[in-house]
Amino acid sequence: KKTAQKNTATTDKSILDQIIRVDHAGEYGATRIYDGQIAVFGKDSKIGKTIQHMADQEQEHIDKFNELLVEKRVRPTALLPLWNIAGFALGAGTALIGEKSAMACTVAVEKVIGEHYREQQDLLEDDEKELKKTIAKFEKDELEHHDIGIAVSYTHLRAHET
């Protein structure tokens, strides 16, 4: 007796590895940017609390990608030491210029990460439904951060106009 096999598409291992490696690096860089901004603004300032909220979500993202690196046997990028220093420096540097600059950095970074997530969902096949769902949730978080950055910048501009 023959059993019917499901015709389910599988994601190419090299594509899967690339997605996880790139996303892990991006989330790591984002956590370091927020660490740099918080180092300047502090956790207790109004902007610091806003940044901490976004940083907490980014930490959830990096934790998940750390799990996926092990689960899917993917090596992280060799550039993590660079992301560590460059991310913190970018965050601290933009924060030193001011809240508006820090939020402009957030808007730009989160826009790029959100676009990557949208594109990656199209590359994942049926065998990676869970990862696709995770990436869709993270994309939503990144777009929220993008919108927070715009809202804070707009509020900051309006305060200076009056």
Model-derived regions: residue spans:
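Helix-loop segments that flank and shape redox-cofactor active sites
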Residues: 6-14, 30-52, 71-74, 113-129
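Active-site flanking loop/helix segments enriched in acidic
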Residues: 12-24
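Acidic/histidine-rich alpha-helical segments that form the ligand environment
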Residues: 23-26, 30, 85-144
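Conserved alpha-helical segments that form or flank metal/cofactor-binding pockets of metalloenzymes
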Residues: 47-82
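Amphipathic alpha-helical coiled-coil segments
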Residues: 64-66, 148-153
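Conserved small/polar residues in nucleotide/adenosyl-binding loops
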Residues: 155-162
